[in-house]
C-alpha cells in the first residue's frame, strides 16, 4: 500500500503531511512553501491556477479568482447571504438550493473548487514522495455538519483520492501535540482559530488514548473576519476623506483585503503599521492614493466584538465537559489567527493557571495530526486510540412537534442508536420521519436535517405497528437514519448529505435559547404531554363505551361525560393553566379506571385488553408521535382482577411479572417512592415504574 497523506483543507491555506519513520512531516509544495493558499484562479486563456500563483494574480483578476470556498461547501443558498456579499466572484444558486460559482460562463460547485486545491496538494505530495498518492485523511472543523463533511469527502473523491477518514481539526491538532506524550495524563484544550472557522475541543490524554470530552465552536469566525473589519475601516475612512466609495470596485476591494491581511500579520509583532496603496482609484481630478496608519490598539478596538465572540465556545466546552478552567493543564494554540496578541490575551485571562502551548506550528498542527491518524489507520502508529464526539444532539420530531432525542450531543462516535415507535392514529399507513438537530424541546426551534416517508404500513389500530428507527453516525461524523416496519420488513433510509449547514450564530443562538427558554420549553412540553394523554383518554373512553357501554351504570356514564366535557373545554381554551389541565386529566383518568373495573367485573374480562392498553397509553405520559413498544413478556395479574397482558407498559417499563414496583405519584395513601409488590394486594391506580 502506498503512502497515506494527511490534509488540512483550510479556508485560507491548506497543508499536507505524511508519516516518515513514525514521525509526521510537512510536505513542501512545488513553490517551496509549507502551506498552500486555498485559492483557485481562472485566467483569460482558460488556464487554471491554484495556490500561490492564483493569489498573485487575484488583484487584477478578482472576479475570476475563488477563495474561502470552504465557507460555502455543503451549505444552502439562503444560509450564505453574508458570505456571498463579501466575495468578488459571482455566486449562483446551484442544484438542491446549494451555492455554485460562475466563472467565465461555467458553473463550479464548492466541491469541484475544493477538489482543485486537493489535486494540487496530491500532485505536490507525489512529487515530494516520488510515488503515486491515492489515499488521504482530510480534516474538517469540529462543527461541520453532516452535509459539509459529506461534501468534503466528495471533493476528495473528485480529486482522485480515497478519503479513508474525515476527522475534526482540533482533534487532529491534539494528536500532533500528544503523540510523544502518551505516558502523560493531561487535560488539554485545543483552541483552533483559523482563516474561516473557530473550534474548541476539550480532551483527556493518557496511555495513548485521546478522548474528546466536549467540543464547541463557530463555523463563521476566523482570520477572514478580522481582515474584513480592517477592510471596512479603510473603505469608510477613504470615503470620508475622498468621497469615493471603494466597496463597489472589486479590484480595489481585493487590494484592500490583501493590505488588511498584511497589516494584521504585522501587528502581531509590531505596535504600528502603515498601509500604503498607491493608485487605489481615480476621479476627474486624477489618481487617488490610500495611506493610513493603523495601531495595534486600534486594530483591537475594530475587532473587539470578534474577540468577545471567542469566549462563548470556551465557556460552552467547559460546561459540556463539566470541567473548571483551573483543571485544564495546557491550551494548544492552532491556526494562524492565534498569533494575534489580543487572542492570546483572551485565552490567558480565561485560563490563568494553564500553559499556552506553541510547540507545534499553528499552521501545520492539524495536517500533522491528520498524518498521524493516517498512520493509525495504516498500522504504522500503534497504541493510539482516538475517541471523537458529535457536537449537537440528533433526533426526531414526534407527536405535537416535540423533539425526541436519539443521540445526545458530545456522544462518542462512531455510534448507533435505535428506538421502536408506533403510529399515532388508527389506520395510519405511512409515517414521516423528520430528522432534526439541536437542543430545544420543540422541533420547530431546532435545525431540520431532512425528511423521508415510510409507506406501506398495513392499517391497524394506533400503537400496534412497530417501527424501528435507527440513527448511525460513522467515524467520519456522517449520519444515516433508517426506519423499518417490523411487521412487513419494509425499510427506508436517508443519508444526510444535501442539507444546509448551521452557522456559528445559529449554533450559539440555539444553545443560548435552550438555556434561556428552558422553563418555557418544559411548560410547552408538559402541555403537549397532557394534550396527548387527554387524546388517549378520549379514545379509550369512547372505545370502552362502544364495546361494553351496557355494563356501565348510568350514573358512572354521566360522571364520565361530565369529566370528558370539562377536559375538552379546557383543551380548547387558550392559556389554560397546566395545573388545572393536569387535574382534569387525572380526574378523567380515574373515572375511566372505575368504568374499566366495572366493565370487567360485570363482563368477566370483556374489557381487559382495552383497559391494559389504557394503562399503557396514559400512565407513561408519552409525548411521542409514535409510542415506544415492547412485547413477548409474561403476563401479570393484580388482585383486583385486572389482567396486564404481555407487553403492557407502566410508565414506559414492561411488566415482567413478580417485580417490585415503586409509585411515582403520591396518591391513594402511598408515599412517593413507597414500594409494594405488584402481584400482591394492590390495584394499579397511578403511574408506577420498575425498580431493581
From Swiss-Prot:
Family annotation (Pfam families): HSP70
GO molecular function terms noted in the UniProt entry: ATP binding; ATP hydrolysis activity; ATP-dependent protein folding chaperone; heat shock protein binding; protein folding chaperone; unfolded protein binding
InterPro entries xref list: ATPase_NBD, Chaperone_DnaK, Heat_shock_70_CS, HSP70_peptide-bd_sf, Hsp_70_fam
One record GO biological process: chaperone cofactor-dependent protein refolding
CDD domains recorded: ASKHA_NBD_HSP70_DnaK-like (cd10234)
Top-level lineage group: Bacteria
SUPFAM superfamilies (alphabetical): Actin-like ATPase domain, Heat shock protein 70kD (HSP70), peptide-binding domain
The keyword ATP-binding appears for this protein: yes
Similarity comment: Belongs to the heat shock protein 70 family.
Free-text function comment from the UniProt entry: Acts as a chaperone.
Cited PANTHER family: HEAT SHOCK PROTEIN 70KDA
NCBIfam families per the UniProt record, alphabetical: PRK00290.1, PRK13411.1, prok_dnaK
Record's protein name: Chaperone protein dnaK1
Species of the source: Synechocystis sp. (strain ATCC 27184 / PCC 6803 / Kazusa)
Amino acid at each position: 500500500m502506498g503512502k497515506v497523506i494527511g490534509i488540512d483543507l483550510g479556508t485560507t491555506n491548506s497543508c499536507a503531511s505524511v508519516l516518515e519513520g513514525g514521525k509526521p512531516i510537512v510536505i513542501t509544495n512545488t513553490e517551496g512553501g509549507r502551506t498552500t493558499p486555498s485559492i483557485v484562479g481562472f485566467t483569460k486563456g482558460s488556464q487554471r491556477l491554484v495556490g500561490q500563483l492564483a493569489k498573485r494574480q487575484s488583484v487584477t483578476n478578482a472576479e475570476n479568482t475563488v477563495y474561502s470556498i470552504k465557507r460555502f461547501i455543503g451549505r444552502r443558498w439562503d444560509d450564505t447571504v453574508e458570505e456571498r456579499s463579501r466575495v468578488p466572484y459571482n455566486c449562483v444558486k446551484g442544484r438542491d438550493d446549494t451555492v455554485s460559482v460562475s466563472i467565465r460562463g461555467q458553473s463550479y460547485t464548492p466541491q469541484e473548487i475544493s477538489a482543485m486545491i486537493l489535486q494540487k496538494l496530491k500532485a505536490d505530495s507525489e512529487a515530494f514522495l516520488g510515488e503515486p498518492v491515492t489515499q488521504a485523511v482530510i480534516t474538517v472543523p469540529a462543527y461541520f455538519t453532516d452535509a459539509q463533511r459529506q461534501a468534503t469527502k466528495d471533493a476528495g473523491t473528485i480529486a482522485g483520492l480515497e478519503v479513508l477518514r474525515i476527522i475534526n481539526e482540533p482533534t487532529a491538532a491534539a494528536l500532533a501535540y500528544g503523540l510523544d506524550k502518551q505516558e502523560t495524563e493531561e487535560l488539554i484544550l485545543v483552541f483552533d482559530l483559523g482563516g474561516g472557522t473557530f473550534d474548541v475541543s476539550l480532551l483527556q490524554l493518557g496511555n495513548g488514548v485521546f478522548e474528546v470530552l466536549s467540543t464547541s465552536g463557530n463555523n463563521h469566525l476566523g482570520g477572514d473576519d478580522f481582515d474584513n473589519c480592517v477592510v471596512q475601516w479603510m473603505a469608510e475612512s477613504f470615503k470620508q476623506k475622498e468621497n469615493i466609495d471603494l466597496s463597489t470596485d472589486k479590484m480595489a476591494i481585493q487590494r484592500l483585503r490583501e493590505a488588511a491581511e498584511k497589516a494584521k500579520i504585522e501587528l502581531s509583532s509590531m505596535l504600528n503599521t502603515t498601509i500604503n496603496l498607491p493608485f487605489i482609484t481615480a476621479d476627474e481630478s486624477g489618481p487617488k492614493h490610500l495611506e493610513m496608519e493603523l495601531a495595534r490598539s486600534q486594530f483591537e478596538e475594530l475587532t473587539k466584538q470578534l474577540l468577545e465572540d471567542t469566549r462563548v465556545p470556551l465557556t460552552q466546552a467547559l460546561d459540556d465537559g463539566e470541567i473548571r478552567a483551573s483543571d485544564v493543564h495546557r491550551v494548544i494554540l492552532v491556526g494562524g489567527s492565534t498569533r494575534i496578541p489580543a487572542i492570546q490575551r483572551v485565552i490567558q485571562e480565561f485560563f490563568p493557571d494553564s500553559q499556552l502551548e506553541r510547540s507545534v506550528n499553528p499552521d501545520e498542527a492539524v495536517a500533522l495530526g491528520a498524518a498521524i491518524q493516517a498512520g493509525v489507520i495504516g498500522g504504522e502508529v500503534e497504541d493510539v486510540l482516538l475517541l471523537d464526539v458529535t457536537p449537537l444532539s440528533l433526533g426526531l420530531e414526534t407527536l405535537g412537534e416535540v423533539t425526541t432525542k436519539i443521540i445526545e450531543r458530545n456522544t462518542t462516535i462512531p455510534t448507533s442508536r435505535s428506538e421502536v415507535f408506533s403510529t399515532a392514529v388508527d389506520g395510519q399507513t405511512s409515517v414521516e420521519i423528520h430528522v432534526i438537530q439541536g437542543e430545544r424541546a420543540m422541533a420547530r426551534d431546532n435545525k431540520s436535517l431532512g425528511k423521508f416517508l415510510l409507506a406501506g404500513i398495513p392499517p391497524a389500530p394506533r400503537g400496534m405497528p412497530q417501527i424501528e428507527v435507527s440513527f448511525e453516525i460513522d467515524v467520519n461524523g456522517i449520519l444515516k437514519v433508517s426506519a423499518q416496519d417490523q411487521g412487513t420488513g419494509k425499510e427506508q433510509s436517508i443519508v444526510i448529505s444535501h442539507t444546509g449547514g448551521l452557522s456559528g450564530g445559529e449554533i450559539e443562538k440555539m444553545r443560548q435559547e435552550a438555556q434561556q427558554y428552558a422553563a418555557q420549553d418544559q411548560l410547552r412540553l408538559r402541555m403537549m404531554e397532557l394534550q396527548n394523554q387527554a387524546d388517549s383518554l378520549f379514545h379509550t373512553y369512547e372505545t370502552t363505551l362502544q364495546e361494553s357501554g351496557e355494563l356501565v351504570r348510568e350514573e358512572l356514564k354521566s360522571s364520565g361525560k361530565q369529566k370528558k366535557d370539562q377536559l375538552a373545554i379546557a383543551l380548547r381554551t387558550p392559556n389554560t393553566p397546566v395545573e388545572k389541565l393536569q387535574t382534569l386529566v387525572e380526574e378523567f383518568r380515574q373515572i375511566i379506571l372505575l368504568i374499566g373495573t366495572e366493565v370487567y367485573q360485570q363482563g368477566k374480562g370483556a374489557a381487559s385488553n382495552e383497559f391494559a392498553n389504557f394503562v399503557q397509553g396514559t400512565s407513561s405520559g408519552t409525548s411521542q408521535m409514535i409510542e415506544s413498544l415492547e412485547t413477548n413478556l409474561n403476563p401479570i395479574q393484580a388482585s383486583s382482577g385486572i389482567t396486564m397482558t404481555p407487553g403492557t407498559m407502566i410508565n414506559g417499563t414492561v411488566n415482567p411479572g413478580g417485580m417490585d414496583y415503586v409509585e411515582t405519584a403520591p396518591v391513594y395513601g402511598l408515599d412517593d417512592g413507597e414500594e409494594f409488590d405488584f402481584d400482591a394486594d394492590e390495584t394499579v391506580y397511578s403511574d408506577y415504574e420498575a425498580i431493581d
